[in-house]
A protein has these predicted regions:
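Glycine-rich, anion-gripping cofactor-binding loops and their flanking helix/strand elements
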Residues: 1-14, 55
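Short, glycine-/Ser/Thr-/acidic-enriched flexible segments
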Residues: 1, 25-27, 41-44, 62-64, ...
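Hydrophobic/aromatic beta-strand patches that form the interior of the parallel beta-sheet core
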Residues: 20, 35-37, 204
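Flexible glycine/proline-rich, aromatic-decorated loop/lid segments
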Residues: 25-60
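Long, low-complexity segments enriched in small/aliphatic residues
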Residues: 96-194
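Flexible, low-hydrophobicity surface segments
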Residues: 55, 155, 174-176, 224-231, ...
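Long, contiguous, secondary-structure-rich segments that constitute the structural scaffold
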Residues: 66-122, 185, 189-205, 209-297
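Phosphate/diphosphate-binding loops
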Residues: 8, 16-18, 22-27, 61-81
Length: 297
């Protein structure tokens, strides 16, 4: 459901001969799997996470995993063993320290100074960090950029019209995204009692002027349709939404916004136009069953 081109994703998954999914929850994708490998959550395993803020963070196992859930590294090594590979990592937590040392050697230009022992002491270190005495670099490009003259090169961008613009049949622009209470597809947050109580159902946001023009009120059922798919959900007023646009979060499987997106590519950057497409909005429609993920599911 998180794939921004959901029609393509569903078609591709349906054509597979065998699908294996590793996850901590039975997600929409996991329900399609032939085999589900139950994984462990962050506090149930020891390992590192490297973020886009250039930080390597150590996480230590704090609690035992439930049921048959296993750590990622254990699962990977069992698959490798089944494929005839002779991996023999030694040490605690299935040899996670040895695996990290392999990563450090492969990424020596960035994290050579971040040893496993150092992470045990400091918990997290920012890279690039090239020696154990190096404190790390929270900010990069302070003195110069990686260009021939050391200066940043700014290039003015020309506005290119969208591939699919509103017309008489599809007069609105669809914007998809996240909302405060639910992360991505809600596989975790919709199981959180408090968060799910705040935002339990799928809604579309429109400004008051557009709602008045469509003759719909707060909480009314509307149907949003593009040339590729449609969803039915309730409408809420948000005057922060531009006139002529409708915002739909993609956290709800019962009203999957990514069924409607446009996969056309930008002619230069080849970036899909998933965040902009033309849609029609009509009052009424039949809501899909909202079963929720269930807190204990």
């Amino acid at each position: 459901m998180s794939d921004p081109d959901l029609n393509h994703a569903r078609h591709s998954l349906a054509t597979l001969e065998h699908l294996v999914v590793q996850d901590i929850f039975m997600t929409e994708t996991a329900w399609l799997a032939d085999v589900v490998l139950p994984a462990t959550a962050w506090p149930e395993k020891t390992g590192t996470v490297s973020n886009t803020d250039r930080m390597v963070q150590l996480g230590k196992q704090a609690i035992d995993p439930p049921g048959q859930a296993k750590a990622d590294l254990w699962i990977i090594q069992q698959i490798a063993k089944g494929l005839g590979l002779h991996w023999n990592y030694q040490g605690e937590h299935h040899g996670v320290a040895e695996v990290y040392e392999e990563m450090r050697q492969a990424m020596h230009a960035a994290i050579s100074g971040i040893t496993w022992d150092r992470l045990q002491r400091e918990s997290s270190v920012t890279y690039p960090c090239l020696s154990e005495e190096d404190p790390g670099a929270p900010t990069v490009f302070i003195d110069h950029f990686a260009t021939d003259d050391g200066r940043v090169h700014l290039v003015p961008a020309d506005i290119i019209p969208a591939n699919e613009r509103p017309d008489s049949d599809y007069p609105f622009v669809l914007i998809t995204g996240r909302q405060l209470e639910h992360w991505h597809t809600g596989s975790m947050t919709r199981r959180a009692t408090v968060l799910d109580a705040i935002e339990p159902t799928a809604t579309a946001s429109m400004c008051g002027a557009d709602m008045q023009r469509l003759k719909v009120g707060l909480g009314d059922v509307i149907t949003i349709a593009s040339r590729r798919g449609h969803v039915t959900l309730r409408v809420r007023r948000d005057d922060g939404t531009p006139q002529g646009a409708v915002f739909v979060p993609f956290a709800y499987y019962e009203a999957a916004a990514n069924l409607m997106t446009n996969a056309a590519l930008d002619p230069f950057g080849k970036i899909p136009e998933f965040k902009y497409c033309a849609v029609a909005v009509h009052a009424g429609g039949e809501l899909s069953l909202n079963a929720g993920f269930g807190v204990n599911a």
